[in-house]
Design a protein with these regions (language model features):
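Glycine-aromatic micro-motifs
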Residues: 1-201
């Protein structure tokens, strides 16, 4: 069935699970909190701050062949938040980026990618000029399952952050504690941009 482009644009970042999971060629299997993850030594931990947390988006990126399983681990990252980037994605959504914000504890996921999976993710993230690939270190991050993490790779916006009068705008769909700024849904942020660019429309 062909995907409705308007629905895709308006529903970013798409449904995000509440627990860690294995993504395997479009199928997801929950990882129990007491389950031990193995085989991560040769994988790269990449923090997902927007739609890469959602199996729906992972299914769009990893299709057409057998990509193998991807462990996707729920975390709580301290002193950062998921906020909007000031650009429009090719599919019409206002996407996310990571911003340092003291006192915020944001629920995000880490994708553990093997070499082939990482190459594919690069193709979907850094083929344009909107995101760069980097490393965050010295983090305070709690993991639901798997080994402790002190550093993680990330695709972060090269455009900065989308701000209103109070600062960067958090994603309402991404759970967080300690926010002092009003978060907006995808529809709300699109309306905000419309009103800024074309008041009274």
């Amino acid at each position: 069935m062909q995907e409705d482009p308007l629905t895709r644009a308006k529903t970013y970042p798409y449904p995000i699970p509440s627990t860690s999971f294995i993504f395997d060629n479009g199928e997801t299997t929950a990882i129990e909190a007491d389950e031990r993850l193995t085989g991560l030594a040769d994988r790269t931990p990449v923090l997902a701050v927007g739609s890469n947390q959602s199996p729906i988006q992972l299914s769009r990126k990893f299709n057409g062949r057998d990509w193998g399983p991807i462990p996707v681990v729920r975390t709580v990252l301290h002193n950062y938040d998921s906020v909007y980037s000031p650009h429009v994605a090719s599919y019409g959504s206002i996407p996310a980026t990571l911003q340092e914000v003291a006192g915020v504890r944001v629920s995000l996921f880490v994708t553990w990618l093997d070499e082939v999976q990482l190459t594919r993710m690069h193709e979907t993230e850094v083929s344009g000029a909107n995101y760069s690939f980097g490393l965050l270190s010295d983090l305070q991050i709690e993991v639901e399952v798997g080994p402790p993490i002190e550093a993680v790779h990330i695709y972060n916006s090269t455009r900065g952050t989308l701000c209103d009068d109070h600062g960067p705008i958090p994603l309402l769909e991404v759970r967080a504690e300690g926010r002092s700024r009003r978060a907006m849904s995808q529809l709300e942020v699109q309306e905000h941009i419309r009103d800024v660019l074309n008041p009274g429309m």
